Amino acid sequence: MRQYCLLLIVLALAAALSDNAVASTLAVARSEIGAPSAVYSERLLRSEPQDEDTFEDRAFGLNWLRLRWLRLGAAKAKTTDVISARESKWIEAWANKNLSPNYVYKQLGLAKQGDKAMQSQNYRIFEAYTERLFAKDQALYTKWLDAKMTPEDVYKALKLDKLLGAKAANSPDFRRYEVYMFKWHELN
């Protein structure tokens, strides 16, 4: 059934395009009968000459199809920037688990894509996740600064003092501690 529909569409398109060719050859043939020196390339029904920008085909022009494709493409471009409810649940779950951005980047398959990762549909999810983490961290820094916590207090609050040696430096919270220490020293 699908093949017949496709065949019907192709035949209709060919007929419509050939109808325009037949109309122009008929105009030339009729003009040679009446006055051999005058050759008309447009339809005989027009009373005033038309330029190419306003020329209309007898069956239909393909400009409406191009315009529709452009409109659909623009609508699709607008919707791809919006994160769906399902994707926002993923982002929230990842933020609650405190997953590192590098881990999420790999899980979304962006590491395999190399330079083309920014063109992927998953890249907008990654951007939304990093923005969510950034907002979460900024709220923490503001809370700690308002409470006038020293870097040592934050170190203990993040429980980095319980980790031994190099384990503290490998912890995801250690980066938060470093950023807070920088912000605290800027203000004091």
From Swiss-Prot:
It is found in: Secreted; Host cell membrane. A motif (RxLR-dEER) lies at residues 43-58. InterPro entries: RXLR. Residues 1-16 form the signal peptide. Its main location: secreted. A motif (Host plasma membrane localization motif) lies at residues 73-78. Disulfide bonds: none annotated. Keywords: Host cell membrane, Host membrane, Membrane, Secreted, Signal, Virulence. One of its GO terms (cellular component) is host cell plasma membrane. The keyword Signal applies. The keyword Cell membrane does not apply. Effector that triggers cell death in a variety of plant species (including tobacco, tomato and soybean), regardless of the Rps genes present. Avh241 interacts with the plant immune system via at least two different mechanisms, one recognized by plants dependent on subcellular localization and one promoting infection independent on membrane localization. The cell death triggered by Avh241 in N.benthamiana requires the two host mitogen-activated protein kinases, MEK2 and WIPK. The RxLR-dEER motif acts to carry the protein into the host cell cytoplasm through binding to cell surface phosphatidylinositol-3-phosphate. Belongs to the RxLR effector family. This is RxLR effector protein Avh241. It comes from Phytophthora sojae (strain P6497).
